[in-house]
């Protein structure tokens, strides 16, 4: 009887040791996800991921006016960007990138973007000519950048330290309605068993394409709300994602639909998107209007 008890205790001890080790390993594989707050009155989007071994991965970065806070973040973390993903070329996403690429104190190893040639943008969204000119001027005037640019392929998986970035969406040249937003690159980041979906400014048409081609891959624990939380991705897409946490790159005026100092005085659809998330019973929200948020993800 004593031998049986002894064996049982040994087995229990081994199980506890294995479970404890697995827990420690998992805890040591966390990442820090930073959602940057705006430093101007404009809407913007910028995220940083700090991996287990302190590699820095960026998604967009905000406007040119937001560049200083991102520069400070990069330099305080060693001055090296392992990978920079640009979802699309609008200035509220790529403006900070345009400034920081000219900083000799910052090294960028790889730049991931899925873009058309300049003429396509001018033909399909001439109203954003200034954004288009600014972005392509940076590429044309810094030829060394072109050696760092990688154009990812659909369904490609990019391993960076303890995270894996899956490319669910790339440029959509056939979609010419809301052309630049609908050309947003869509990323799904996995760390351990947690997933984060970055939609950029995905619109209705690109939502439909994502649902058709990537429906089984869209479910994610965390989602970045498309087009700053309004007039972006469809409710159907969010239902498929079924997130537990929402990341809102949304300033206060847009959150409140406030165009003149009065809530609900604007034309924006943020309140509608908020209702969608209530119906999905999402309990946790990180909102740009509340300032920079640093999130630890296991």
Task: Explain the meaning of each model-derived region.
Residues 83, 110-113, 207-291:
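Cap/insert and terminal regions of metallo-dependent hydrolase folds
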């Amino acid at each position: 009887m004593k031998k049986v008890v002894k064996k049982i205790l040994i087995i229990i001890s081994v199980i506890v040791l294995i479970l404890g080790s697995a827990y420690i390993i998992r805890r040591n594989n966390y990442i820090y996800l930073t959602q940057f707050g705006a430093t101007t009155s404009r809407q913007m989007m910028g995220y940083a991921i700090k991996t287990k071994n302190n590699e820095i991965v960026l998604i967009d970065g905000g406007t040119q006016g937001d560049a200083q806070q991102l520069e400070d973040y990069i330099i305080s973390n060693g001055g090296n960007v392992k990978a920079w993903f640009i979802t699309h070329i609008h200035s509220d996403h790529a403006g900070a990138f345009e400034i920081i690429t000219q900083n000799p104190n910052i090294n960028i190893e790889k730049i991931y973007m899925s873009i058309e040639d300049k003429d396509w943008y001018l033909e399909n969204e001439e109203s954003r000519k200034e954004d288009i000119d600014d972005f392509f001027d940076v590429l044309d005037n810094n030829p060394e950048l072109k050696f760092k640019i990688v154009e990812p392929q659909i369904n490609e998986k990019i391993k960076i330290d303890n995270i894996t970035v899956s490319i669910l969406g790339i440029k959509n040249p056939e979609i010419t309605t809301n052309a630049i937003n609908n050309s947003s690159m869509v990323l799904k980041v996995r760390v351990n068993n947690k997933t984060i979906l970055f939609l950029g400014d995905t619109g209705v048409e690109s939502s439909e394409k994502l649902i058709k081609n990537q429906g089984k891959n869209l479910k994610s624990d965390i989602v970045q709300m498309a087009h700053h939380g309004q007039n972006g991705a469809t409710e159907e897409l969010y239902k498929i994602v079924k997130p537990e946490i929402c990341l809102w790159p949304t300033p206060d005026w847009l959150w409140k639909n406030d165009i003149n100092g009065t809530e609900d005085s604007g034309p924006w659809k943020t309140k509608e998107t908020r209702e969608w998330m209530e119906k999905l019973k999402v309990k946790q929200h990180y909102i740009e209007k509340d300032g920079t948020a640093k999130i630890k993800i296991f």
